[in-house]
């Protein structure tokens, strides 16, 4: 899985570097060109020592290719911050000091967008999540605060509205898998967010 995700990231970088290879004239609703976006919302962890959430957000940028009059494919990279979450008392009472989780990291992936009309669209996305986190191990009797770096994945979906030809807003759900089995730490996070996108 790790090798697959790394290969996807390198492939995404290569595609972003070569937008001129695709046609610029694929229809009225499908979007094509460079874009940047930002999300803000609520990141929730419900696993082992953690059952809570915090303010979270993300930024991203990429290039979108029109595949047909309604469909486009974006190749994008970004960075996500998924907040700090307090541990449940069952775990934290056995640890002295900090018991909060923290999760963030870079992303590289694909975004498939379908335009229902000139104004409304839906999209699905996914790719590699290069997680950098810390938190308690999943051990009720002797939890330890550890740090980890791992290559995992993310996936999500959203519904958006084109306010103007260049600006759009959307409601989104994304899932970020973040774990290190060797260290027995698992911070899978659900992100519920609103987003804005600007297209150049």
Regions found by a protein language model. Give the residues of each.
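Bacterial N-terminal signal peptides
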Residues: 7-16
């Amino acid at each position: 899985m790790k090798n697959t995700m790394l290969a996807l990231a390198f492939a995404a970088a290569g595609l972003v570097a070569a937008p001129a290879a695709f046609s610029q004239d694929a229809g009225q609703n499908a979007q094509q060109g460079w874009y940047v976006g930002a999300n803000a919302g609520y990141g929730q962890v419900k696993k082992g020592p953690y059952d809570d959430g915090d303010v979270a957000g993300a930024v991203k940028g990429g290039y979108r290719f029109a595949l047909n009059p309604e469909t486009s494919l974006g190749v994008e990279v970004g960075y996500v911050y998924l907040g700090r979450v307090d541990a449940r008392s069952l775990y934290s009472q056995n640890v002295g000091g900090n018991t909060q989780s923290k999760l963030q990291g870079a992303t590289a992936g694909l975004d498939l967008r379908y335009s229902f009309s000139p104004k409304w669209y839906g999209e699905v996305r996914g790719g590699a999540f290069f997680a950098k986190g810390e938190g308690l191990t999943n051990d009720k009797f002797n939890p330890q605060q550890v740090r980890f770096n791992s290559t995992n994945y993310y996936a999500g979906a959203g519904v958006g509205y084109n306010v103007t030809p260049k600006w759009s807003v959307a409601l989104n759900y994304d899932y970020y898998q973040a774990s290190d089995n060797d260290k027995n730490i698992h911070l899978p996070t659900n992100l519920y967010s609103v987003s804005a996108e600007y297209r150049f």
